[in-house]
Amino acid sequence: SCQKWMWLCDEERKCCEDMVCKLWCK
């Protein structure tokens, strides 16, 4: 899980949306 203010998740360029790390979310 992740927090809204977290942009990077893992080592990929992902962001946090709905407490989940996703690719290319806004």
UniProtKB/Swiss-Prot annotation:
Tissues where the protein occurs: Expressed by the venom gland.
Single annotated GO MF: sodium channel regulator activity
Main localization, broad class: secreted
Disulfide bonds: C2-C16, C9-C21, C15-C25
Location(s), subcellular: Secreted
Keyword annotations of the record: Cardiotoxin, Disulfide bond, Ion channel impairing toxin, Neurotoxin, Secreted, Toxin, Voltage-gated sodium channel impairing toxin
GO cellular component terms attached to this protein's record: extracellular region
Family: Belongs to the neurotoxin 30 (phrixotoxin) family.
Main function: Gating-modifier toxin that non-selectively inhibits voltage-gated sodium channel Nav by shifting the threshold for channel activation to more positive potentials. This toxin moderately inhibits human Nav1.2/SCN2A (IC(50)=404 nM), Nav1.5/SCN5A (IC(50)=218 nM) and Nav1.7/SCN9A (IC(50)=333 nM). Inhibition of Nav1.7 is voltage-dependent, with lower inhibition at more positive test pulses.
Official protein name in the record: Mu-theraphotoxin-Phlo2a
UniProt lineage: Eukaryota, Metazoa, Ecdysozoa, Arthropoda, Chelicerata
